[in-house]
Amino acid sequence: MWVNPEEVLLANALWITERANPYFILQRRKGHGGDGGGGGGLAGLLVGTLDVVLDSSARVAPYRILYQTPDSLVYWTIACGGSRKEVTEHWEWLEQNLLQTLSIFENENDVTTFVRGKIQGIIAEYNKINDVKEDEDTEKFKEAIVKFHRLFGMPEEEKLVNYYSCSYWKGRVPRQGWMYLSINHLCFSSFLMGREAKLVIRWVDITQLEKNATLLLPDMIKVSTRSSEHFFSVFLNINETFKLMEQLANIAMRQLLDNEGFEQDRSLPKLKKKSPKKVSALKRDLDARAKSERYRALFRLPKDEKLDGHTDCTLWTPFNKMHILGQMFVSTNYICFTSKEENLCSLIIPLREVTIVEKADSCSVLPSPLSISTRNRMTFLFANLKDRDFLVQRISDFLQQTTSRIYSDKEFSGSCNSSDDEVYSRPSSLVSSSPQRSTSSDADGERPFNLNGNSVPTATQTLMTMYRRRSPEEFNPKLAKEFLKEQAWKIHFAEYGQGICMYRTEKTRELVLKGIPESMRGELWLLLSGAINEKATHPGYYEGLVEKSMGKYNLATEEIERDLHRSLPEHPAFQNEMGIAALRRVLTAYAFRNPNIGYCQAMNIVTSVLLLYAKEEEAFWLLVALCERMLPDYYNTRVVGALVDQGVFEELARDYVPQLYDCMQDLGVISTISLSWFLTLFLSVMPFESAVVVVDCFFYEGIKVIFQLALAVLDANVDKLLNCKDDGEAMTVLGRYLDSVTNKDSTLPPIPHLHSLLSDDVGPYPAVDIFRLIGTSYEKFGTIRADLIEQMRFKQRLKVIQTLEDTTKRNVVRTIVTETSFTIDELEELYALFKAEHLTSCYWGGSSNALDRHDPSLPYLEQYRIDFEQFKGMFVLLFPWACGTHSDVLASRLFQLLDENGDSLINFREFVSGLSAACHGDLTEKLKLLYKMHVLPEPSCDQDEPDSAFEATQYFFEDITPECTHVVGLDSRGKQSADDGFVTVSLKQDRGKRANSQENRNYLKLWTAENKSKSKTAKDLPKLNQGQFIELCKTMYNMFSEDPNEQELYHATAAVTSLLLEIGEVGKFFITQPAKEDAVPGPPCGQAIPGMLFPKKGSSQSYVVESTEPLTASLAVDSEEHSLGGQMEDIKLEDSSPRDNGACSSMLISDDDTKDDSSMSSYSVLSAGSHEEDKLHCEDIGEDTVLVRSSQGRATLPRSSSLDRDWAITFEQFLASLLTEPALVRYFDKPVCMMARVTSAKNIRMMGKPLTSASDYEISALSG
């Protein structure tokens, strides 16, 4: 390609000149190409090794063209190429278009200017024609991308993130090379002294990623997969490399978990022209994502908030009259601050609250100050800002966007929910739109919303307000303490501010740890969790969800209904319909908001507590914060998040209570207790009034406090747990301890915990104060940091998700192993290959949406599905019949056959059923599969139109022929009705019964798998018409095209084809014969025409295949130029017996009235062979045997333009005819080694794209 001219001082160093003229030189890199001239040898090896180690661009473009004037010592690179052909084209263009022109110039400087301008003009014109946009990647990185795609055969869709120099340890020998990190793969390439080694590992196959340090190798990264371990060392910046590897592995695990693909963020601001371009645009994107994730976690912001930038500054804090050093963070909707000293002060200022941003006057005490005022009359003063003008401009831009969004939201929502006070003051009305309650009113704690003209009942008061059970005389001391807590919080608000913009300090945490007053609990939960931000930015969202979900039912709503009455049944608020209805609405609304989660057990317990202290909409947004931000992946079908934190808890227990760890591991208690403790935040194992204090701390500190509390519980029971003999005893000890945790400050009447009611305590357990327990947890385990937990979570997430994937694989294999002929090992390999193809299509694209192909709610066997494009690739590599140009057509037919439900996707069970029949089925099963693939109608067929192939035969065989209405096609399924994909077989007794076909279809949908399997016997298979028979012949000829016994198989196929043509012709005679019975009487039913069923004594038959040209040429199938019929016209059948002019020689299909009308008789079809010793004797023929005879003349396959609509054959005839040819029998009986095919499929790359990779693989051996 043409490149911008660059100066080269040493033109011949490490390069060999191949062609030259007065102005241009074509050179080749030493070590590339072995056609003499010093290309090989030791010098070439050294140069090649040097290029790899130094990452030279000559590794990508080993050819180049230089420009030089005769009297100058400076050379200019003007073109380069990866192949000799590419660079030769550029050379010839220069000779034809520039060489003559340059001789006209007299000044060498003019020549140089002209050449440089010409080359730059060519590049600009190319970019304009091809619409090449400005790329932020450096030229060096672009070369690395080209090298990456060429070295590892990756498609263009595979994006390189970064590459690093390192050493890979193969045994005890390090191989110096380059590690390439792409979105989906970790790759390594090394070229030393002529030996090249490559390694490719998919991120989804990694089970462990560790940064280790040993005495010999202080910095080393260990990458583990299911089958091997890999070690990399000698990094220039190991921390940066490892962080990027962690991030890419996390993206891969997210893809396994919920099928989320990676999409590059195109909205990142471009770098300034003056800033150096050191990293790729994709690396910048990933770095920005990591920073945004930390930013959101630190300040509890919504999931879609993106960090724009951060800067060091100071904040003036009026409560202690100090300037606190810290960092300011600016994003699209928020300005946040956190101090350098942990927990000293933090601040969150939503831009929706900001009224004024102005630059204050600078002074020696306050250099570069910035003042920000909010609606609640708070002013924040920042100083020591490095680039204040730029910062003010960015904040102003974001403020304009925020203001426009606020106005548009107001216009959308109107006045129906402009403020809570307005809504509360509205008169109540009867509401009858709820499916659970017909009426409700404000007096009962519910209010009507007028959204789009519909009324949606939503509770306006907390359930605790309506169902408070306390007696002032009985609880006076506790009420006094509660009052003091409220006053302490009010004083705190007056000093530090109230609402989202308040200063959050160590004092705030102290008040939370002492317990939040009941009257303030809902407000502070919203504030501390960040749910108040989502509620404020989504007005009317919850009411819309409630309205949308009303009256709709699915699996989630069924599970919700089942668990409603199990949610705090001991509390009076959930002993009546009002509390139950509010809980139902919140859970159902969230299930519709997040269908990936829907509903998970334990959500009902947590939500019921939220409803006690927060209004209904507030409880919904608290649930959103809990499920999507604070406890990620906890509440899904596989509770992955809880399992990850269970692993983290085990590690923490090993570090902090080592004396107990081994004992707990032996008893298996940690895994049992952690799920129930973490999923419900101790609400299900601790008395209610104590558990809500844990929830208070959780909303302030996050998951950190749950780990601390769990460790404190174990630490308090060390001695008793060490004396336990089994897990039941240990669980009893912990259960009794948690039941004894009390809250002496609670103003609620004691609510007996359900666990304590059911347990048989031998005696009272000493009471444990919840505040003392929490204090102890901070004293002993307060050093646990949130960033440490995140690191441990990553390590456990890899292990947990891969363990779940292995469990899923075992469950699938165990379920399906009895249905197929594959071994367990073969099924496991096939499943890994099938899933890998599904995942590959997710990130490299496919013809269907990846989310449609993966549904975690389905059974394991149906979770991963592939479309036709993916199936076609696997068909070519795994199926024994894939051969030649006909493979795509055959794959399409098999895909239609396997796609039983007609959704254009097949799951693993369907895939394996077809593969098992084709590879390990007996001869009859294989031929039945081949027959069924061709009896399917064409994709363009219309469902309501009768199949033309059987139109005539069905009329006369209504009493015995099953009717097949299975019409499927890749292109036409979208237009078909809901009955698509069901095979409907109805044994017709009368033509008038066609009207009942719909009832039959509905009935057959209810058939069990056993009944379906019975209906697919050979007798029930539809007949093959002439067009389908032609396609079957084409398939068979293509199947044999690469077989060693190709000629023998062609001869055998020709004989079988001729035989079946004759059978079809005679079958047509006996089909049309009954229609003429009135005019021409036929023979009695029980009699056969003499000489037709049995040959005359002494007569013999033989089929002789003659051809005027070699059989290979005459029988070759070329669908583009000729039809199959024209190619088979030279197939002749000769009969040595006298010809009977009165009847057509054929196979007799005896439709005796004495046979059962509902089934077809089985016939053994026999044919005399071409050898004398194969003659049949009368005593060898059974009662139901039909002898095949042929007529004189030629039997040819008709052309498609003149198909005979009455011609048809059955599967029994096809099977029996093929059995007459030993060559065909041997071919279909030939065993197939599936493991060998799977192994080759792992490494084969098709069209520059790896089909699949079930695990890590080496492209070339690293042992060299």
UniProtKB/Swiss-Prot annotation:
Residues 886-921 form the EF-hand domain. InterPro entries: EF-hand-dom_pair, EF_hand_dom, GRAM, PH-like_dom_sf, Rab-GAP-TBC_dom, Rab-GAP_TBC_sf, TCB1D9/TCB1D9B_PH-GRAM1, TCB1D9/TCB1D9B_PH-GRAM2. The record marks 562 as: Arginine finger. The keyword Repeat applies. Keywords: GTPase activation, Repeat. Pfam families: GRAM, RabGAP-TBC. The record marks 601 as: Glutamine finger. Residues 515-702 form the Rab-GAP TBC domain. PANTHER family: PROTEIN VASCULAR ASSOCIATED DEATH 1, CHLOROPLASTIC, TBC1 DOMAIN FAMILY MEMBER 9. Residues 146-213, 293-361 form the GRAM domain. This is TBC1 domain family member 9. It comes from Mus musculus (Mouse). Residues 425-441 have a biased composition (Low complexity). Residues 410-456, 1119-1162 are annotated as: Disordered. The arginine and glutamine fingers are critical for the GTPase-activating mechanism, they pull out Rab's 'switch 2' glutamine and insert in Rab's active site. The keyword Repeat applies. Residues 1119-1138 have a biased composition (Basic and acidic residues). May act as a GTPase-activating protein for Rab family protein(s). GO terms for molecular function: calcium ion binding; GTPase activator activity. SUPFAM superfamilies: EF-hand, Ypt/Rab-GAP domain of gyp1p.
